[in-house]
């Protein structure tokens, strides 16, 4: 868990936000997908060795919709790669770290993901992600 993978930014509309990241910042658009389990659409951009993820809620009961209502658009989370998410979650649990997810769930790009409570991380939502087998060495 020593490498930053991506930074998640909550937006009301990917379509409206995309132009800034592509045309103003000059970031390369990678792809867009729907993550049904999270009730969001996401779009990824390459920013050096890190990706930016724009996150748009699909429904009013999406956690991202609730985040946007409470805090508005902006930084949603930072995500770190880990080799074995299940083992990492167990190690954190053994250290009494408060987790949002005790078990991995499905995220974008086929990754397994889990979140650490912001109460543990000075108010920052931290995501841990384990890439699919063929993505472990991506951008290294």
Curated annotation (Swiss-Prot):
Single GO MF annotation: methylmalonyl-CoA epimerase activity
Domain VOC span(s) in chain numbering: 3-131
Any GO BP: L-methylmalonyl-CoA metabolic process
Residue ranges of coiled coil: none
Binding site for a divalent metal cation: 6, 53, 77, 127
Keyword terms: Lyase, Metal-binding
Keyword Metal-binding: yes
UniProt family annotation: Belongs to the methylmalonyl-CoA epimerase family.
NCBIfam families cross-referenced by the UniProt entry: metmalonyl_epim
PANTHER family registered for this protein in UniProt: METHYLMALONYL-COA EPIMERASE, METHYLMALONYL-COA EPIMERASE, MITOCHONDRIAL
Protein known as: Uncharacterized protein YqjC
């Amino acid at each position: 868990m020593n490498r930053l993978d991506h930074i998640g930014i909550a937006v009301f509309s990917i379509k409206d936000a995309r132009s800034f990241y592509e045309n103003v910042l000059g970031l390369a658009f990678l792809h867009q997908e729907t993550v049904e389990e999270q009730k969001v659409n996401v779009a990824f951009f390459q920013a050096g060795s890190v990706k930016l993820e724009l996150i748009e809620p699909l429904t009013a009961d999406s956690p991202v919709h609730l985040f946007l209502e409470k805090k508005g658009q902006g930084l949603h989370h930072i995500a770190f790669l880990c080799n074995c998410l299940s083992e990492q979650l167990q190690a954190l649990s053994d250290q009494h770290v408060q987790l949002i997810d005790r078990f991995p769930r499905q995220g974008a790009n086929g990754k397994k993901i889990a979140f650490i409570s912001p109460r543990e991380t000075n108010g920052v939502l931290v995501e841990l992600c384990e890439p699919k087998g063929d993505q472990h060495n991506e951008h290294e």
